[in-house]
């Protein structure tokens, strides 16, 4: 029986109690799906109109010329096959991209001069090349100029309408000034705002403000229309004897004290006396009885009201009062009415006056006051006003003003709300416009102002701009779409001009288009956009996290300086969408976030998180994804709510979230429940076991530091994990997964060949070859190396891990090592978080990592002649050339040190004029060495290691040297091996099928020696015929003959395809390289160095506990346990209480218990090897994993599988304790007891130096520690002499510039304080910027003398020059010293 791969898996004991109904989505789905939608390649459905790249073309095309006699239309687009694959692009420093071909149609019209009618004269279609479009690799990255980059998703404010206030900060009175802003996806912003006097203003694009009524006039409303839109009308009818009768609304008087008696108009009864408060009970009574419909108000009460409509004299059309005018009465000294607009109306016989329903309590007169202040009265003057604000200094005309206003908000080319913006606006203002209505309408603007005025009247709430319903994500596809649109618009202008200037009848679309601007826009985006980042490739986790990052910075986003506290803070809507823990420390805190584990981005760009549906108090397995806005309507319980067997809530009151508040709610009101406790946090945070026991600040550091862990020489999965290590290793692409099920056919360190057994399609050879990446350099100079996990003959299922990558162990993420730690001080060496380590750690390469540096040298064609890469270097001894081959390039495997030559290179130098004698000697001896200088590539100071790879690139047509040819031969051999393997498997597959087809059939005729009508048997096939002759057998059955024919055709076609692919690859290898201009040849050398753990290296746990190694102590001096085991690390116990990351202690205890259980299994295996009895092994496994797991998976294993599974866990039984649902204190105690340890988790330790027992028990256990990418080797640096700054002549600073130590202002004070005059003088002159002095010092040191003289420092000369720059001539005079 072929042994399956399952037995090799390491079993983890899972401590989670909550059943998860939903698998975690693919971790890099955000990137992949977004870019697939943009390009519409791969499995994405065919392009819909208006989406992706097709939508971009459709928004720019058709392009008409200025006379509209011709049109260029977009028909379709297609991406061709990329020229180079991912690996080739990375090796050649190229961009992984595919050529984009666009089909365009040029239509030329004939225009009738008399009628102006158009008729089609000519139509031409053509495919036009539009530049290269970068493709995404299967891991969600882009290869740009040979380096892997990630496009980070951006969080920005969603388009739509937002209401806000200034929090009382603008005006000294602290009054809230409300504002409203309409933000489009692209186009002009429109703001409406109140000022301190309660006048409403509008601003376009943050320019000068205008009264809002000006904008409404420009939209075509008149005064009456405006008043009608914003106010209800109330009629005042005059009853001669009693006063005015007006409608009565009881709600409006609730809580007020009327200034006059409220009198029922029908009965004359007083409902409420003046000055008495109207109670809510009285109002309810009035509403219930419903018999009071009209009030009688005093005659004077109408004064101060505003007229709702123009009141006109019917006979002559004269206006008595205009809409919005205030009603007035004028009295004489005796109190008699002598004038005013009310008297005028009454005199004209008008007793029914419509007034605006403004009571200054529920409805304020803001719009009416604004209108009164506005000097404009008509559309024309309003448009002119807007034009003056938008185009100051230009003389306005009505036509120009009208055209400008239309293009601002109503032209789809200039203004786009986007579908999101329209949906948000419809929801906020309760409108019902179609999604496709992407520009503003008159109704939208009117509704916005109405909502703003209602806010001022105290109705409704302002929006919270940090709510995730108001922030959306722009992923790769959308960012790219916007960038491409910019490029096409630049191109559009050029096309229009060209269409008008050329003879349009004779040109093809190709002649009109210059694709450079579009290609440049794409290149600029990938090369230099703030969101296109160099991928963080330290380890697989850092890759995944980088792809899931959400940044609020970048073009169109925030800037660090302007972002306040609110934007950075955690918001209730982040729950399950963005991680509240993982964010950088420092100026970017809260602006750069990480997507939560289960979150996804919907088609509108809002982040959604999944919930299980609760129906009638029962939790179902139905899962709904909800955006933050949808979630506000629901009551959501937490995943850890207690449920019984029927999935019903046990408790009557359940802890829930309701519209941003955390409350206890009755269980029947709950309608959703979280799918998992870890949906709250990001991937990095969910890798921290016992996260629930850590302080949030430390958890933040823990999440961030896991991303800096360096891949070690031998990866080791954590004993105490959380169960998602496997998912991260799988989705990051670090480990290799089988694409389809099959049998392992061949295997070596470089590749795995699998014979596929499923998903076979017609014409498919059924061979999968997986090439492993061997010792490749990552972006962070760490080492990418993959190792096979499988053996020949094993069967693998689709999606199984067949090879481990960097920082993965048996398909699980493994960032560090499990080591024995003791929390105890040791002679002060763990003061301030320092770490003491045992020599065993350094000796056994426990924390050793490999780092690969890349060195590059180019031979250019200079003005004086070409540079040359050669072994023949002037004035260099044979010793220095020992590592170079005959071509002058270092050989692979050479150990190199600082100063060693890697590639020999000579550069011609300028000829100095020669004397005739020199010319003669030159002619006789052919001496050439003098006119070249040595510019070889040497190893930098502080670098050392082993050469692991050399690549040579030659320009087209340049002759290749021996080394380049050798590399080429090796590459071709490798390709040939792949082809031969594929052919071999193809042959075996085809001939096996052919054999099954032929056996037992009758052959009518065949090759020589086969008689007619022979029954085909095994002897005939194996002994009489060669395999090639099998095809010549003609079968009796017509159907069989057809199958044979089809099989033969398929075989030949596959062989041809294989050969063509091989030829294509070989041609690419042999073809010259595209090098930058002027470069003839380029050599890259890769040097690998092993970095052992040493003092000064930074280490950390997963709980934010970090420290620097202070000392390496011999193993025999370390504290040891009673059985003689020395501990590996001593950590400071004082680092725990104040930091409140107790999770590390629980992890230490749990790891200790896991190690103990592993040792028990090891003992059982020893017994088995002695006695052959499996029972102790089964018992030990049952005890370690518990009855459930044992019955489910282990009891059914056969002997080999069980021994293999047990052998995998002898160093400790791996456990998984998921975040917020992991092992509790009782579980830790129970595990310690089962492992045979004390419940306290503490052990007696002995001092390694004296052998004495320590005074009290010490916490000892297994802890997972990481070595971080802050290595002392990269930081330590020394300089004797080196480069100087040009102006000040002082040494440069920093390791990268090979700089010196800064002796700054404060250090000078220190020497001054000690009176160390001579030392100070040296520091400020000869050791710094006294140019003449330092040269003399150097010379005197060489001669062995010890006297020197300090001169004038160069910085003093700089000061003199600056003073002269101010116009003051300052000179240094050499005064003769008088005795």
Swiss-Prot record:
Gene Ontology CC = DNA-directed RNA polymerase complex
The record's listing under PROSITE patterns reads: RNA_POL_BETA
Q: Which domain of life is it from?
A: Bacteria
Gene3D superfamilies per the UniProt record, alphabetical: 2.40.50.100, 2.40.50.150, 3.90.1100.10, DNA-directed RNA polymerase, beta subunit, external 1 domain, DNA-directed RNA polymerase, subunit 2, domain 6, RNA polymerase alpha subunit dimerisation domain, RNA polymerase Rpb2, domain 2
Protein's GO biological process: DNA-templated transcription
EC code(s) of this entry = 2.7.7.6
Record-linked PANTHER family: DNA-DIRECTED RNA POLYMERASE I SUBUNIT 2
Write out the function statement from the record. Answer: DNA-dependent RNA polymerase catalyzes the transcription of DNA into RNA using the four ribonucleoside triphosphates as substrates.
Protein name, please?
A: DNA-directed RNA polymerase subunit beta
The species is: Ruegeria sp. (strain TM1040)
Organism lineage reads as: Bacteria, Pseudomonadati, Pseudomonadota, Alphaproteobacteria, Rhodobacterales
């Amino acid at each position: 029986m072929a042994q399956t791969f399952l037995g090799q898996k390491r079993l983890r004991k899972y401590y989670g109690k909550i059943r998860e109904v939903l698998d975690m989505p693919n971790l890099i789905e955000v990137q992949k799906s977004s870019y697939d939608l943009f390009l519409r390649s791969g499995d994405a459905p065919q392009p819909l109109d208006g989406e992706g790249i097709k939508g971009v073309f459709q928004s720019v095309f058709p392009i008409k010329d200025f006379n509209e006699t011709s049109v260029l239309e977009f028909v379709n687009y297609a991406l061709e096959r990329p020229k180079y694959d991912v690996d080739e692009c990375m090796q050649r420093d190229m961009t992984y991209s595919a050529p984009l071909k666009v089909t365009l149609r040029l239509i030329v019209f004939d225009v009738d001069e008399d009628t102006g009618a158009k008729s089609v004269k000519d139509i031409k279609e053509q495919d036009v090349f539009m530049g290269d479009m970068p493709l995404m690799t299967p891991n969600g990255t882009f290869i740009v100029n040979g380096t892997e980059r990630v496009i980070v998703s951006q969080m920005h404010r969603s388009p739509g309408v937002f209401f806000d206030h200034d929090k009382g900060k603008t005006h000294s009175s602290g009054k809230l000034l409300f504002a409203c802003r309409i933000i489009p996806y692209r186009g002009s912003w429109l703001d409406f705002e109140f000022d301190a006097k309660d006048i409403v203003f509008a601003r376009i694009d943050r320019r000068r403000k205008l009264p809002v009524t000006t904008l409404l006039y420009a939209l075509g409303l008149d005064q009456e229309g405006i008043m009608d839109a914003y106010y209800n009308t109330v009629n005042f009818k005059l009853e001669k004897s009693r006063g005015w009768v007006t409608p009565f609304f009881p709600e409006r008087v609730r809580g007020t004290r009327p200034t006059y008696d409220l009198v029922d108009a029908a009965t004359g009864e007083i409902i409420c006396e003046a000055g008495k408060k109207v109670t809510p009970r009285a109002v309810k009574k009035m509403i219930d009885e419903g018999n009071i419909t009209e009030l009688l108000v005093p005659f004077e009460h109408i004064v101060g009201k505003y007229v709702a409509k123009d009141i006109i004299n019917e006979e002559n059309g004269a206006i008595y009062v205009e809409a919005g005018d205030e009603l007035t009465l004028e009295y004489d000294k005796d109190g008699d009415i002598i004038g005013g607009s009310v008297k005028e109306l009454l005199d004209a016989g008008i007793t029914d006056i419509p007034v605006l329903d403004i009571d200054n309590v529920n409805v304020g007169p803001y719009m009416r006051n604004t209108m009164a202040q506005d000097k404009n009265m008509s559309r024309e003057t309003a448009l002119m006003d807007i034009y003056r604000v938008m185009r100051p200094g230009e003389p306005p005309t009505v036509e120009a003003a009208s055209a400008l206003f239309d293009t601002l908000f109503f032209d789809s080319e200039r203004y786009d709300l986007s579908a999101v913006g329209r949906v948000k606006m419809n929801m906020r203002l309760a409108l019902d416009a179609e999604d496709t209505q992407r520009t503003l309408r008159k109704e939208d603007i009117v509704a916005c102002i109405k909502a703003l005025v209602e806010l001022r009247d105290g109705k409704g709430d302002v929006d919270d701009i940090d709510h995730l319903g108001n922030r959306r994500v722009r992923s790769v596809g959308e960012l790219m779409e916007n960038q491409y649109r910019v490029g096409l618009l630049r191109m559009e202008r050029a096309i229009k001009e060209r269409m008008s200037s050329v003879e349009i009848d004779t040109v093809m679309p190709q002649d009109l288009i210059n694709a450079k601007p579009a290609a440049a826009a794409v290149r600029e985006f990938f090369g230099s956009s703030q969101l296109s980042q160099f991928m963080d490739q330290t380890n697989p986790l850092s890759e995944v996290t980088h792809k899931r990052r959400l940044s609020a910075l970048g073009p169109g986003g925030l800037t660090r300086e302007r972002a306040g506290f609110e934007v950075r803070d955690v918001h209730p809507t982040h729950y399950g969408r963005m991680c509240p823990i993982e964010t950088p420390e420092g100026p970017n805190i809260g602006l750069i976030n990480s997507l939560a584990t289960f979150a996804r981005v919907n088609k509108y760009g809002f982040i959604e998180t999944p919930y299980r549906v609760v129906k009638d108090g029962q939790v179902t397995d139905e899962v709904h994804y909800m955006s933050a806005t949808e979630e506000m309507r629901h009551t959501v319980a937490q995943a850890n709510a207690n449920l019984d067997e029927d999935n019903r809530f046990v408790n009557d009151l359940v802890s829930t979230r309701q519209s941003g508040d955390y409350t206890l709610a009755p269980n029947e009101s709950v309608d959703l429940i979280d799918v998992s406790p870890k949906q709250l946090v990001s991937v990095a945070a969910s890798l921290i076991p016992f996260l629930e026991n850590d302080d949030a600040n430390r958890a933040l550091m823990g999440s961030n530091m896991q991303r800096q862990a360096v891949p070690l020489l031998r990866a080791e999965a954590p004993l105490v994990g959380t169960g998602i290590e496997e998912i991260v290793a799988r989705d990051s692409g670090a480990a290799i997964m089988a694409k389809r099920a099959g049998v392992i056919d061949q295997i070596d360190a470089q590749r795995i060949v699998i014979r596929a057994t499923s998903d076979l399609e017609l014409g498919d050879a059924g061979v999968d070859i997986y090439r492993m990446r061997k010792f490749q350099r990552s972006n962070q100079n760490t080492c990418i190396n993959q190792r096979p996990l499988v053996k020949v003959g094993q069967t693998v299922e689709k999606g199984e891990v067949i090879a481990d990558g960097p920082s993965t162990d048996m398909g699980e993420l493994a960032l560090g090592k499990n080591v024995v730690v003791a929390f105890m001080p040791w002679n002060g060496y763990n003061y301030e978080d320092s770490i003491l380590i045992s020599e065993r750690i350094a000796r056994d390469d426990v924390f050793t990592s490999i780092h690969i540096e890349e060195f590059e040298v180019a031979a250019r064609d200079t003005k004086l002649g070409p540079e040359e890469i050669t072994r023949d270097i002037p004035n260099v001894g044979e010793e220095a050339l020992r590592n170079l081959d005959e071509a002058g390039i270092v050989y692979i495997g050479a150990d190199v040190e600082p100063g060693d030559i890697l590639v020999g290179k000579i550069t011609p130098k300028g000829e100095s004029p020669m004397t005739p004698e020199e010319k003669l000697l030159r002619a006789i001896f052919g001496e050439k060495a003098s006119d070249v200088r040595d510019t070889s590539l040497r190893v930098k100071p502080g670098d050392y290691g082993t050469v692991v790879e050399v690549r040579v690139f030659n320009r087209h047509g340049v002759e290749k040297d021996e080394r380049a040819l050798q590399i080429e031969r090796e590459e071709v051999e490798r390709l040939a091996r792949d082809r031969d393997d594929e052919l071999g498997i193809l042959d075996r597959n085809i001939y096996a099928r052919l054999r099954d087809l032929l056996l037992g059939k009758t052959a009518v005729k065949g090759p020589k020696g086969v008689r007619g009508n022979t029954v085909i048997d095994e002897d005939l096939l194996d002994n009489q015929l060669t395999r090639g002759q099998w095809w010549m057998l003609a079968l009796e059955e017509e159907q069989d003959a057809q199958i044979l024919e089809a099989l033969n055709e398929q075989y030949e076609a596959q062989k041809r395809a294989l050969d063509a692919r091989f030829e294509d690859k070989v041609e690419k290898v042999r073809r010259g390289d595209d090098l930058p201009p002027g470069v003839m040849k380029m050599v890259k050398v890769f040097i690998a160095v092993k970095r052992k753990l040493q003092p000064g290296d930074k280490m950390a746990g997963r709980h934010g506990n970090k420290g620097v190694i202070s000392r390496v102590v011999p193993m025999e001096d370390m504290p040891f346990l009673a059985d003689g085991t020395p501990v590996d690390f001593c950590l400071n116990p004082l680092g725990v209480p104040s930091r409140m990351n107790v999770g590390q202690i629980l992890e230490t205890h749990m790891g200790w218990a896991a190690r103990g259980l592993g040792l028990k299994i090891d003992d059982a295996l020893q017994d088995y090897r002695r006695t052959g009895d499996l029972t102790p092994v089964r018992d030990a496994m049952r005890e370690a994993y518990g009855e459930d797991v044992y019955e489910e998976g282990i009891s059914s294993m056969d002997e080999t599988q069980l021994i293999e599974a047990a052998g995998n866990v002898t160093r400790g039984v791996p456990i998984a304790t998921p975040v917020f649902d992991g092992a509790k204190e009782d579980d830790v105690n129970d595990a310690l007891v089962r492992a045979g340890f004390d419940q306290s988790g503490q052990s007696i330790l002995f001092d390694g130096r004296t052998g004495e027992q320590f005074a009290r028990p010490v916490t000892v256990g297994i802890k997972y520690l990481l070595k971080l990418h802050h290595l002392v080797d990269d930081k330590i640096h020394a300089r004797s002499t080196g480069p100087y700054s040009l102006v000040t002549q002082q040494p440069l600073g920093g390791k990268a510039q090979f700089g010196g130590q800064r002796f700054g202002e404060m250090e000078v004070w220190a020497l001054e304080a000690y009176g160390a005059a001579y030392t100070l003088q040296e520091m400020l002159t000869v050791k710094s910027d006294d140019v003449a002095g330092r040269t003399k010092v150097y010379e005197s040191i060489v001669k062995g003398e010890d006297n020197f003289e300090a001169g004038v420092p160069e910085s003093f000369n700089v000061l003199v020059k600056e003073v002269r720059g101010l116009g003051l001539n300052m000179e240094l005079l050499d005064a003769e010293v008088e005795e």
